A protein has these predicted regions:
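Repeated loop/turn-to-beta-strand initiation elements of outer-membrane beta-barrel proteins
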Residues: 85, 125-129, 179-184, 222-227, ...
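Outer-membrane beta-barrel "beta-signal"
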Residues: 33, 467-480
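Transmembrane beta-strands of outer-membrane beta-barrel pores
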Residues: 91-97, 133-139, 188-192, 230-234, ...
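Residues that define the transmembrane beta-barrel architecture of outer-membrane proteins
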Residues: 81, 107-113, 163-168, 208-212, ...
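N-terminal periplasmic/intermembrane-space "pro-region" immediately following the signal or transit peptide
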Residues: 2-108, 114-124, 343-346, 351
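Extracellular/periplasmic loop regions
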Residues: 144-157, 311-410, 460
């Protein structure tokens, strides 16, 4: 009943926000240059619903009707009738085995099915609306896995897919192409910026992360894109489900955050992007995730000849505490990646550093670079050992290779080696492999495996060094 109540409250709050701010929003993100070595496996994150094409006035509106009658009895019903339904169903099995990790004495086995169903109206004078709900059900006994700490299975390692039913999108949008292209959106929505390293919908999990926000995007001149959003609530993947402790760091965030992103794509060899993410976040665990991050990157690809394509990325950012965060620190981030695509093979290497800074505020010691609103699964290993970044920072050296087998079956291999950024700690290494196959227009099948081997220093999520974590996933997904 609590989930239903939470869903009802979100409908009321979101609906009010939509009425008060009907003229603003965030448009669907254009596809960015992705990091080939760390990008999320294809077709695993459900796509945002496509927007239906505009339609004419409903035939039932009489030709001589007054404008109000045409609007209410013709154009509004027409926009509803010519809208688009979307359906996504993902059946997934996840198994987690953590050796030498206290207090886990058993494995987790999580067979779940996620059903997402929504509807988007056709455009009406530039306006559109969307409603979408999600249900996550467990196929079998719920006590076979630790549902993110919400079901009392503390002897099993956590799997971030608790069962729930909730509203996950409810927004009103506006788009105009007159003079200066402009789009806006208000309400509960997906927001994916760039490669989702800082802001994303965490689409790997069965319940995606959404944002209660109002924002806009404008293109004042060709190839220059300006984006701003104000976020007042973050609906995280755990959904504040029953049983989740009140002080859990996994609960939804109350927010007073500003997202700013500026991109320029006139260069044929890539895109230049600058950003500022001012995150004022709090939940039952406190305000320690509040941070201000400023940075930018250049990423793109260039042909060497008609058979070889080189891709590259260079990014730098710095971060300080923000708003009510009691910590006082400053930390840097940088990422360099170089790859080559020689069909049907792609190879590459990268170096990502999430720095660390001395803390002169509450808690003392050091504070690591934070990414609390990121889509975390694609980065620093699929075993998700470093979802919580170490206080001493993290250096991730990775290599990847992908080969596309006959029948368009990509197989990806990634190797990670981890070190502390401050000090001489060795966090271990990880091997990842993934194979996927699309069947027709609507179906995708995926199998993924991650094997983490700890060394002399324990990662933040671990209770001891030399922990071995193995995770396995098998999924079938239908998108319509």
């Amino acid at each position: 009943m609590s989930n239903i109540s939470n869903c009802h409250n979100k409908i009321v709050l979101t609906g009010g926000a939509m009425v008060l701010a009907v003229t603003a929003s965030v448009f669907a993100q254009e596809k960015p240059f992705m990091q080939a070595g760390t990008s999320q496996p294809p077709s695993l994150s459900p796509p945002q619903a496509t927007e239906p094409a505009a339609t004419g006035t409903n035939a039932v509106a009489a030709a001589d009707a007054n404008p109000l009658e045409k609007f209410l009895n013709g154009e509004v019903p027409d926009a509803i009738a010519h809208g688009k339904f979307n359906l996504n169903v993902r059946l997934r099995y996840e198994q987690v085995d953590e050796d030498n990790q206290t207090p886990y004495t058993k494995n987790s086995y999580a067979p779940t099915v996620r059903t997402r169903f929504g509807y988007t109206t056709a455009p009406l004078y530039g306006f559109q609306g969307m409603l979408e709900g999600v249900n996550i059900s467990v196929l079998g006994p719920e006590h076979n896995y630790n549902a993110a700490g919400s079901n009392g299975q503390g002897a099993r390692p956590p799997v971030g897919d608790p069962p729930m039913t909730r509203l996950d999108q409810a927004w009103l949008g506006y788009t105009s192409t007159n003079y200066v292209p402009f789009s806006a959106k208000v309400g509960q929505q997906q927001i994916n910026l760039d490669n989702q390293r800082f802001i994303g919908d965490a689409g790997w999990r069965q319940n995606m992360q959404t944002f209660d926000a109002i924002g806009a995007r404008v293109t004042p001149v060709k190839d220059l894109n300006l984006y701003y959003s104000y976020v007042w609530d973050v609906n995280r993947v755990y959904g504040d489900v029953d049983g989740l402790p009140a002080a859990s760091p996994n609960r939804d965030f109350d927010s007073r955050s500003h997202l700013i992103n500026v991109s320029y794509a006139a260069c044929p060899y890539g895109r230049l992007v600058g950003y500022a993410y001012l995150l004022d976040l709090s939940n039952g665990a406190g305000n320690a995730n509040s941070c201000a991050t400023y940075g930018g990157y250049f990423a793109g690809a260039a042909p060497v000849n008609d058979k070889v394509m080189v891709d590259y990325r260079a990014e730098f950012a710095w971060q300080d505490q923000y708003a009510d965060n009691p910590q006082r620190y400053s930390a840097d981030y940088y990422n360099f990646e170089l790859g080559a695509n020689i069909k049907p093979i792609a190879i590459g290497t990268g170096y990502e550093v999430l720095g660390s800074g001395a803390n002169s505020g509450a808690g003392g010691e050091r504070v690591g670079f934070k990414t609390p609103l990121a889509s975390l699964h694609p980065f620093n290993g699929w075993a998700e050992v470093f979802i919580t970044h170490p206080n001493n920072g993290l250096q991730d050296i990775y290599e990847y290779a992908q080969v596309t087998l006959p029948e368009q079956i990509p197989v990806r291999f990634i190797y990670h080696k981890y070190y502390a950024d401050s000090g001489s700690g060795n966090y271990g290494q990880e091997f990842d492999v993934m194979i996927s196959k699309k069947f027709g227009k609507y179906w995708n099948v995926m199998v993924e495996f991650a094997d983490y081997l700890g060394e002399n220093v324990a990662a933040p999520a671990l209770t001891a060094p030399k922990v071995n974590i193995q995770k396995f996933w098998a999924a079938v997904e239908f998108n319509f």
